[in-house]
């Protein structure tokens, strides 16, 4: 299994390179055991977002032409500072054409639905974040989304938990969630299944925490709301938590469709090594990564931007709304 993540390694030593690639939004490492026993999928509680059916899938060249129009709108990545993701993790990046040539995981055949798997308990405000994130992912990836019935944290055994030795945070092991909770429960029509938890995440030895982690090949991922702030603290706090959660969810879902970290532009698919770096990343995809999503899902770029702008307007994400509207105006 190939995995990606973003996250915070322990300060005392660099993490040993594991035998697989991983991906997460803010802290990460892989690990985990394979579970051979299969289980019947749980019947999901569906809060569906219908697919935003495109007029017609665009060709690679048509997408390339449209994305070239958008390039002036996006900031190129500068030299990373000490502590930033790319300062510590040298990554090659991935162009749109490299992505197409890689035979990526994408929604094909009967595998067309994105599933959100709540893991553990949530407050009412956190539950609303889950619902809005499901709606956003449907618009972002042009897929119907179903939210499944909750799975309790009691499914995580003691060997896949720890208390952080310095901070005291209670954490669950991401590899166990991917391999032993999600993979055996993967529905037959799942384009991807992404677990969301209010628990802190930990990917294994050498790492302090991760915001999320996903498999590049197995259609499963997990991300956490734990470090995104308290959404019940007021409207501004709710919007901040929502935006952070949307970024992580979109980033991890991108990995589940075989998208690597972006190294060219300020982009939702950039790796992040700490909270400040994650907060300065946009929720929007750069031209290269947007082309990947539109090609993989059959989304019409202009329709996608219009729907995302409307979502941001409805939920008070004004800066994000303005950006999507600027991009839409260029394509028109």
Predicted features and spans:
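Low-complexity, Gly/Pro
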Residues: 1-7, 11-52
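Active-site-proximal segment of zinc-dependent metalloprotease catalytic domains
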Residues: 183-252, 256
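N-terminal low-structure segments adjacent to metalloprotease catalytic domains
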Residues: 37-186, 190-192, 196, 304-332
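A short, structural micro-pattern
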Residues: 110, 187-188, 216-217, 263, ...
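Generic domain-boundary/flexible-linker signal
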Residues: 125-127, 204-205, 280, 297
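Surface-exposed, flexible loop/turn segments at secondary-structure boundaries
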Residues: 122, 201-202, 294
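Metalloprotease/metallohydrolase-associated module, dominated by Zn2+-dependent proteases
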Residues: 53-74, 221-239, 243-244, 261-332
